[in-house]
Amino acid sequence: MTKIKDLMTADLQYCTVLDNVYEAAVKMKDANVGAIPVVDEDGETLVGIVTDRDLVLRGIAIKKPNSQKITDAMTEKPVSVEEDASVDEVLHLMASHQLRRIPVTKNKKLTGIVTLGDLSLSEQTNERAGSALSDISEGDNREEGFFH
């Protein structure tokens, strides 16, 4: 059975709780991603995730300065999975929480991120990823709330 650690992106950008929203936005731009995990000061323990949507709704749209702490814009305690999680478990979490990406951890330490795109690239998971995307998109008409 395929494990998420076999499909996740392990070489990823992340922010620490010491970063600000400007630094997060630059890292997202440079990596061409729409979300970036946030780790504790130790640089390893996952504590949050910030999306481009979070930066807009919790920062720019309410006229917060670029020096705003990343912790003020991030989603704390994000849904995450351990490296040995199954594809089915991840797809279920994505569909039930309307997520397109989920941080991957090992003993609470950030080791990667898995996206619907990662799952759609695998022949074994492509069809199931499409089904999860359909479930996510059906619930995507929310007016408020912050999701990653």
From Swiss-Prot:
Q: Which domain of life is it from?
A: Bacteria
Report whether Repeat shows up as a keyword of the record.
Answer: yes
Q: Which InterPro entries does this one have?
A: CBS_dom, CBS_dom_sf, Diverse_CBS-Domain
Q: Where is the composition biased (Basic and acidic residues)?
A: 139-148
Ranges of residues in domain CBS: 8-68, 74-130
List the residue ranges of the region (Disordered). 127-148
Q: Show the PROSITE patterns listed in the entry.
A: CBS
Q: Which cysteines are joined by disulfide bonds?
A: none
For this UniProt record, give its keywords in alphabetical order, as a comma-separated list. CBS domain, Repeat
Q: Coiled coil: is it a keyword of this entry? A: no
The identity of this protein, by name, is Uncharacterized protein YlbB
Q: Source species, please?
A: Bacillus subtilis (strain 168)
